[in-house]
């Protein structure tokens, strides 16, 4: 049976299928973890420890050395994405109620959901798209996108926008596994190779545990809103990313569109933030569902939009070249 190959045909499948299975488990048998106990309970409820190991391995997979072009392109995209998420947070905090919207079509929408959906780029999706439509250097620009993974950037955005306050030691605790992994991976290439193999392996495990915090009725209630959130992520982050790629990154805007997705890891952010700041706990389930839907939507639309943009840019460049030759 080609189970893995079938799952991978779904955009973000290795994250979203286990997430859905976990949500099924939580919806129809919410006490399963307590009933079975031991290791089974650990797999069902172990979101934070599994993610801690994943962050460590993610840090170890990042190589410090990179060309100037790669760093400029990567830095431009990462900083722009984070800056846009900060602006969205600052505006949303003045419009959306403190505990999120509780009634009506926008029920479940919160500043936490908006920031979590917008501040992280799907690095793997970006790299695969740019390998097809961009240069080798542009494809390699995902190197710094891994720094967005995890709750740290979301914490910084929420903190600096005045939406939440975090003690300094909480910031350190959030980033420490990543930094230790990063240090070890760059001190020893063999360790980097060893730990980086676990990055993809751990995704289904933390996705399943994360799914066990979601009730499927919440997903049903936020489905259409989640689709609109996914479209909003592409528009709100995509336009500034295109402009930044052209003006600062030295590109033609293709990399900007390719970076306008939501990362699968962003699905875990609301729960992790809620663990650190209990005030966010009531919003976390709906925010998780919204972000999960946004991940699916952006994973489907971003490759299509990038393809269309790239074709138009290349056609325009070819036309200009022909006109220049004629003259």
Swiss-Prot record:
GO function terms (MF aspect): 2-keto-3-deoxygluconate:proton symporter activity
What cellular component GO annotations does this protein have?
A: plasma membrane
Quickly give the catalysed reaction.
Answer: 2-dehydro-3-deoxy-D-gluconate(in) + H(+)(in) = 2-dehydro-3-deoxy-D-gluconate(out) + H(+)(out)
Is Membrane included in the keywords of this UniProt record?
yes
The record's section on HAMAP family has:
KdgT (MF_00070)
Which NCBIfam families does this UniProt record tie to the protein? kdgT
What is this protein called in UniProt? Answer: 2-keto-3-deoxygluconate permease
Naturally occurring in which organism (per UniProt)? Escherichia coli O7:K1 (strain IAI39 / ExPEC)
Which gene specifies this protein's sequence? kdgT
């Amino acid at each position: 049976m080609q189970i893995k190959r079938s799952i991978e045909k779904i955009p973000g499948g290795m994250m979203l299928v286990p997430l859905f299975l976990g949500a099924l488990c939580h919806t129809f048998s919410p006490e399963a973890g307590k009933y079975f106990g031991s290791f089974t309970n650990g797999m069902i409820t172990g979101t934070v420890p599994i993610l801690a190991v994943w962050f460590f391995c993610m840090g170890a997979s990042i190589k410090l050395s990179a060309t100037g072009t790669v760093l400029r392109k990567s830095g431009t995209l990462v900083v722009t994405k984070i800056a846009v998420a900060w602006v969205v947070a600052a505006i949303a905090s003045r419009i959306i109620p403190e505990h999120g919207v509780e009634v009506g079509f926008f029920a479940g929408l919160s500043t936490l959901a908006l920031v979590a959906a917008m501040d992280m780029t799907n690095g793997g999706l970006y790299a695969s798209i740019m390998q097809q439509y961009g240069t080798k250097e542009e494809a390699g620009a995902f190197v710094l996108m891994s720094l967005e993974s995890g709750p740290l950037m979301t914490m910084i955005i929420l903190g600096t926008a005045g939406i939440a306050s975090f003690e300094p030691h909480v910031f350190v605790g959030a980033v420490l596994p990543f930094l230790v992994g990063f240090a070890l991976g760059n001190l020893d290439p063999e360790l980097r190779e060893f730990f980086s193999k676990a990055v993809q392996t751990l995704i289904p495990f933390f996705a399943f545990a994360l799914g066990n915090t979601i009730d499927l009725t919440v997903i049903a209630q936020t489905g259409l809103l989640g689709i609109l959130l996914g479209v909003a992520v592409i528009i709100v982050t995509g336009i500034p990313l295109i402009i930044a790629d052209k003006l600062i990154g030295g590109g033609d805007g293709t990399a900007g569109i390719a970076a306008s997705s939501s990362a699968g890891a962003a699905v875990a952010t609301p729960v992790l933030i809620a663990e650190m700041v209990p005030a966010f706990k009531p919003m976390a389930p709906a925010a998780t569902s919204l972000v999960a839907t946004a991940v699916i939507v952006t994973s489907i639309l971003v490759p299509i939009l990038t393809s269309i943009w790239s074709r138009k840019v290349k056609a325009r460049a070819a036309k200009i070249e022909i006109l220049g030759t004629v003259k």
